[in-house]
A protein has these predicted regions:
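Short, internal strand/loop/helix patches
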Residues: 117, 122, 128-169
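N-terminal Lys/Arg-rich, disordered targeting/topogenic segments
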Residues: 1-9
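N-terminal Sec-pathway targeting helices
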Residues: 8-22
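Thiol-/selenol-based redox modules, centered on thioredoxin-like
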Residues: 159-207
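N-terminal "domain-start" segment that seeds a small globular fold
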Residues: 16, 24-27, 37-73
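Structural signal for membrane-spanning alpha-helices in multi-pass inner-membrane proteins
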Residues: 29-33
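Short active-site neighborhood of thiol/selenol oxidoreductases, capturing the structured segment around
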Residues: 72-100
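Structural microenvironment flanking redox-active thiols in thiol-disulfide oxidoreductases
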Residues: 95-135
Length: 207
């Protein structure tokens, strides 16, 4: 008969082993991207701008453009491509949404490991356009509730949500633990974004 103390120690070791198995690949991915020497697979550099150190983003339940709101942890569990838009979604905005959609679809069997999020100001997007062209998009209304999140995005105004929305459009990459880790400036290519995501997904088993 196994003594209770021995059984408890075995269970603890098993739980520790499972935790290491789950988180070690993501830790490795972070080390390779943020660690000394800035090593990259195949000697290639990432296309996005690294956020050093990665920034934990707040858990917030935010209102959707239509009815309802997000779960407070909606930026966790998956890799997230976040785009922020103020005013009407003109050609440059539509092209950015198109790029992120195509990048996600090009991941093939890993498509479901990535989600797309839009934070939009008043008058941004036509509901029919979003339904027809971007049915997978999580479209969030930029209210004051989003200000703590927007304030943590690099190169954005630290004041109101409206002021932050007025900055140049970028795509932000968030890891499955809710950390902002990379920024794609306006004009960056979708191909580079895709290559970065493929490498990260290959190195990480979570999300």
């Amino acid at each position: 008969m196994i003594q209770p103390g021995v059984r408890d120690r075995r269970q603890r070791r098993l739980l520790i082993g499972l935790a290491l198995l789950f988180f070690a690949p993501l830790a490795l991915a972070f080390y390779l991207y943020y660690g000394p020497g800035t090593w990259r697979p195949g000697g290639r550099v990432n296309s996005g701008d690294l956020v050093r150190p990665a920034r934990p983003l707040p858990a917030l339940a935010l209102p959707l453009l239509e009815a309802g709101s997000t779960d407070a942890n909606f930026l966790k569990r998956k890799w997230t491509l976040l785009y922020v838009q103020s005013g009407a979604c003109a050609d440059s905005c539509r092209m950015r949404l198109y790029d992120t959609r195509q990048v996600r679809l090009a991941l093939d069997r890993d498509t479901n490991r990535v989600q797309r999020v839009l934070i939009a100001g008043d008058g941004c997007c036509d509901a029919q356009f979003l339904h027809e062209q971007h049915p997978d998009l999580i479209a969030i209304r930029a209210t004051p509730a989003a200000a703590p999140l927007l304030a943590l995005l690099p190169d954005r105004d630290q004041g109101s949500a409206a002021a932050s929305l007025a900055q140049a459009p970028r795509v932000y990459l968030i890891d499955p633990l809710g950390n902002l880790m990379m920024v794609y400036p306006a004009g960056s290519k979708a191909k580079g974004m895709l290559e970065d995501l493929k490498r990260l997904l290959r190195l990480s088993s979570i999300g």
